[in-house]
Amino acid sequence: MPFTTLQVFSSYSLLKSTIRLNEYVATGKLLGYKQLALTDDGVLHGAVEFYERCIQNGIQPILGCTFEVAWKSDASKKEMLVVYAKGAKGYESLLKLSTLYQQGLTWTSEMTEWIGSHSEDVKIVLPPMDSEWVAAHSKGRLEAVLGAVKEEYDGIEIAVGITREMVERGEFDTMREGIEAAGVIPVAFSVSHYLNTTDYFPWKVLQAIRLGETLSFTQEDATGSESLPEATSMTKVFQTAVDGVLLSNLEQFTKDLVVEIPLRDTMLPKFPVPGGKTSAQFLYELCEAAMLDMGVTTPVYVNRLKEELAVIHEMGFDDYFLIVWDIMRHAREKGIQTGAGRGSAAGSLVAYLLHITGVDPIRYHLLFERFLNRERYTMPDIDLDFPDDKREDILAYIVSKYGNQNVAQIVTFGTLGAKQVIRDVCKVFGENIITVQKFSNNIAQGKVTLEQTYKENKTFTGEAGGNNSYKNSSSEKVETSKKHTSMDNNSSDSTEKKPENNDETSKVESDNTESDKETKEQETEETESRVNKPDNNELEIIPSN
């Protein structure tokens, strides 16, 4: 009966966790975990990365999400839920819930209704921290409150989390009868916002950055209790506590939280081909007609076309090329300027004949194999360039033709670079602008890390030592933390209480030096969840997985 930490936040819960997924999975494996859970705050940004890393390390991934939702019966009552996926349908339900949550339906009954209508696909845990059900226990209303929650989510398996501390204080003994009377399952529980106990203070610094608050370091801040515990030691604790019931309940609760994400499947919408033809037939006809119109009918073109179409069909991308052709056709019909094409797609004769690109690959000796290759299965990557003010028109056309469910845009994550993290950490400790500039100006411009700076810049190393060592360690720990998301030219800031000029792309204070101002304007570092972010005037065509 191995222990599993049921609530874990990663850096994808923007500025709420110091846990990076690569470190989480590696540490979890070292600590003896057979299962690892990811339950970020309302988002599933890290789900695919987490899933892949777990599978590669022989660990069962448990996918969940943390939501604060209102009750259907009383919207003034809110409860923190961790919702877990059971199978593929459960994962799809989590995606839908995450969408509702991010659309601002955090505290409405719509989420409650959606969860209730998918009772076979999900499970729920009520964490004990700051919860109404734990508060109700002290008022003698535990059974009534849990019974009401059970009624809200009728048909769903619901558990309450019982921590090691609750067992050791004897708290669970006093509430066990009420929990079981309400028909709710008590399970062994812990929560992690950081990996190691010594990461507690850097995590507090991260929260201060998010909330725009200041801190001072005390020795009590050296370690914390919400780290990732060792699986073996927690198993022993809960095996001996209350007849091992919490651990056995945990095992039963998690055994069917199994999800398989079809990572390598091609999920393209079908292009509406006219006249009852197949996509391959229609694609061939378009290319053949274009060859005649363009006067490129010599054997070298004919043979190249046959070869490319064979590869495209064999790899299942006939519809992909028709979709992109149709988008470009629509743009030209509406008088929207299009680019001539760039990157490896310029090596495709099919793309040239469909006017997706404007470069003849045979004339310029460009290789199709660099774009698509039987020996290396990858999706085609075609970048389409449109004017900034026409992007929404193009997107609206795509949505109208294929539906919202088949169209997606790519999120990017602004991260804390070396200069910005030093600024933010100094502000957290109430340093004046001169001190902030002194630290910041000793860091080279560009994508340089704090570790590099410590090694290469003795002046900075001297400034960062001594009484500033805790700032140094905190800065290193929160460096590269994801700070905000953006899509196209819009940004969604992660701050709950947004401090003035906190974001790395915002304007700096008026008394900053000119060089510091230039650096700050340049510093936003972007990382992507799956593919490169398009330029502002570029639309990248990818399948919506």
Regions found by a protein language model. Give the residues of each.
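Alpha-helical scaffold/interaction cores of sigma-54-like transcription cofactors
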Residues: 1-467, 471-473, 535-545
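Mature, Sec-exported extracytoplasmic domains of Gram-positive
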Residues: 446, 454, 462, 466-544
